[in-house]
Amino acid sequence: QARREKGRLRITPCADDSPPQAFLGVRPCDLHAIEVQDRVFLKGGFVDPVYRQRRERAFIIAINCGQPCATGFCASMGTGPRAASGFDLALTEIISPSRHDFLVEVGTDKGAKILQDLPHRSAEPREVEQGEALICRTAAQMGRKLDTAGIKELLYDNYEHPRWDDVAARCLTCGNCAMVCPTCFCHTLEDLTDLTGSQAERWRRMDVCFTVDFSYLHGGSIRPSPRSRYRQWLTHKLAAWMDQFGCSGCVGCGRCITWCPVGIDLTEEVRAIRESQAS
């Protein structure tokens, strides 16, 4: 907030009074997405104070995937189906004809403290093996795969590939894929003033690179076509992200595939480009 008082401008940050939050049932791919967001908001040149406060106060209970989701490919990205880190507690659900149990893995001191107050017992070796077998079976049954070998160079070298025209003919530029992606962080800023001009507020809200206005500079948009906007999104996610943050921007959750109204599948788009190069 900015306020003009006695000829001087006073700028004050808005206090974040949100309560601590607990996230239940967080999937392994989303744990990796949170780690990616940490790189963006906590480990760059500038730290986001609001994100940092909420992140430090969050309590995360993850759940390992006991069956593959319809559009996920986390096994290809190395982000699932087992939670490796980033959780306070991680659960593995084991269902048999006679029992319904949860294996619990402690990830932090906060998680250990919570577990102390809950009835539990030490897992038997056979139960641990049963949980691991369930997770391995999930990985083997995953229906989609993405070949990530040399993917950055593949996309950089095919910036003018005709496949971009093919996908642009189908893409509605609705932005669904970016809005449901757990690693997309783009936003816009809006300045609001009162009628007297003595007070102003700056609000940050989510935005997506599929809108024409997102890349608007003086004179017009630098990405005026669906081709250029989809190419930017996919190339940034799978290639440029590695240069910026040292990791992929895709965690293989498959939400972009699920929520695309015309059925665009990024794994198929990458495969088509790769196969054309091999032929």
Feature names for model-found ranges:
Residues 1-156, 164, 195:
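Iron-sulfur-associated redox domains of electron-transfer enzymes in respiratory
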Residues 28, 178, 257:
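Short, flexible micro-motifs
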Residues 176-192:
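A donor-sugar binding/catalytic signature common to diverse glycosyltransferases
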